[in-house]
Structures are given as structure tokens and as C-alpha cells.
Amino acid sequence: MATTPALYGTAVSTSFLRTQPMPMSVTTTKAFSNGFLGLKTSLKRGDLAVAMASYKVKLVTPDGTQEFECPSDVYILDHAEEVGIDLPYSCRAGSCSSCAGKVVGGEVDQSDGSFLDDEQIEAGFVLTCVAYPTSDVVIETHKEEDLTA
């Protein structure tokens, strides 16, 4: 029985391991690197592929309606800024109400926030600085006054 010394002086048997190579093929296809199941990627050969959802976010602002795709792991406020939408904010940590909005359709995860109480969340209020989309969502923005009224 073949043994190989390992750390701390223990021996590990490798006799059960197959010594002949097994046929296998791993390739990166152009179709996969340009999009898989409708998900947008920017993969290069050797990159690790991680699939995440992206949702349509519609913001109803005093200046009109803005719509964009937002990854499920990015805060709505952050991605809105990335695509050029100016929204109110202050703390960026979910501990004030400057970025308050109201969800009128869809769902968000705002478990990172600490400012809103359960009643406010049930009424549909959201802090865009700590809210991830979990479905396509419509949010009325600039609702700080409604929240504090």
C-alpha cells in the first residue's frame, strides 16, 4: 500500500486513486462567454462564472420615470447613480431617511437597513441605499416627508 506523509506525521493512502487519465473536455464557448440563459457576462478564458439575477427597476421621480436593470447584489441607489440617475441620499447606510421611497410594485430586500420600523416597511417604504431588488420593482422616490409625517 502506497502512503504519502502528510502534515503532523499522519499517513494518507492513495492506492484507491485512479492512475490513468480520464477523458474529459472543459471549454469556454463563445455563447457562454457572451451570455448564458439570458444573463449578461464578461467572461474571459479561465474566469469563474457566477450567475446572478438582474431585475428591472422603475423609479418614479418628481422629474419623471426612469427605468434600468439592476443586479440583485447591488443596492438600488448605487446602481441608479451608475446609470446617471440622481437620487437623494445622506448616510448611505440605512440609518436615516434621506433616500426614502415607496414600493408600489414588486419586492426588495432591505435587511441591511436599521432606520425603518416594521410598520413603515409593511406600508411599502424603502431606503434605496440599502435595498436590493428581489423582483422587478416600481419605486416612488423622494418620500422622506411622507415617511416622517
Swiss-Prot record:
GO terms for molecular function: 2 iron, 2 sulfur cluster binding; electron transfer activity; metal ion binding. GO terms for cellular component: chloroplast stroma. This is Ferredoxin-1, chloroplastic. [2Fe-2S] cluster binds at residues 91, 96, 99, 129. CDD domains: fer2. Forms a complex with heterodimeric ferredoxin-thioredoxin reductase (FTR) and thioredoxin. Its cofactor is [2Fe-2S] cluster. Residues 55-145 form the 2Fe-2S ferredoxin-type domain. The lineage of its organism: Eukaryota, Viridiplantae, Streptophyta, Embryophyta, Tracheophyta. SUPFAM superfamilies: 2Fe-2S ferredoxin-like. The keyword Transit peptide applies. Belongs to the 2Fe2S plant-type ferredoxin family. Residues 1-52 form a transit peptide. Keywords: 2Fe-2S, Chloroplast, Electron transport, Iron, Iron-sulfur, Metal-binding, Plastid, Transit peptide, Transport. One of its GO terms (biological process) is electron transport chain.
